[in-house]
Amino acid sequence: MSEPVRTDPAQEALAALAGRSDVAFREGQREAIEALVDRRERVLVVQRTGWGKSAVYFVATRLRRLADAGPTIIVSPLLALMRDQIAAAQRAGIRAVTMNSANVADWEEVASALARDEVDVLLVSPERLNNPRFRTEQLPDLARRCGLLVVDEAHCVSDWGHDFRPDYRRIKDLLADLPPVFNVTATTETANGR
């Protein structure tokens, strides 16, 4: 009698995301995923463009959803980046949607899908996250059920430089309201002491 084949859900998620079975984790990716999924730590990933920061949070999302965690919220600064992330997530079988200024007519449908737990990833801009209506109507339930909060391009939190966005600074208020065991990851290509 042969032994059952053991599968690695993280490797399967990475392969689905990459669209090929021979893909391997880069140094540090699996460790970041394990910190998020197994130890439920807050993680900062600082790596160059193209390293695979999004693979960390998409694989972590897949594993957390397999463990019955709620959806991931990704705070992302650019609509074009959100579109790219949604396409990548969907290739991996991750149900990703967005609420942003370009799809106002879809917000009610997205909110309903979130309420029915039919969304794995919600991408929002920092401005949407801090919108008073979103904070009162959507965020309380999302914060209660959310499996992971991702602050993508976290260098935008800095209050210095050309990339400053005031609503990124307000994310700290949201983080302060979350339980200390709440999974959070931040990704950036650059980081400094600020």
Q: What label would you give each PLM region?
A:
Residues 2-5, 83, 117, 155, ...:
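ASCE RecA-like P-loop NTPase motor cores
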Residues 39-45, 70-72, 118-120, 179-180:
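Pre-Walker A (Motif I) flank of P-loop NTPase domains
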Residues 46, 51, 56-95, 177-178:
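Conserved SF1/SF2 helicase motif Ia
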Residues 58, 103-148, 156-162:
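Conserved helix/coil segment N-terminal to the catalytic DExD/H
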Residues 140-148, 153-194:
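Post-DEXD/H (motif II) to motif III coupling segment of the RecA-like Helicase ATP-binding lobe
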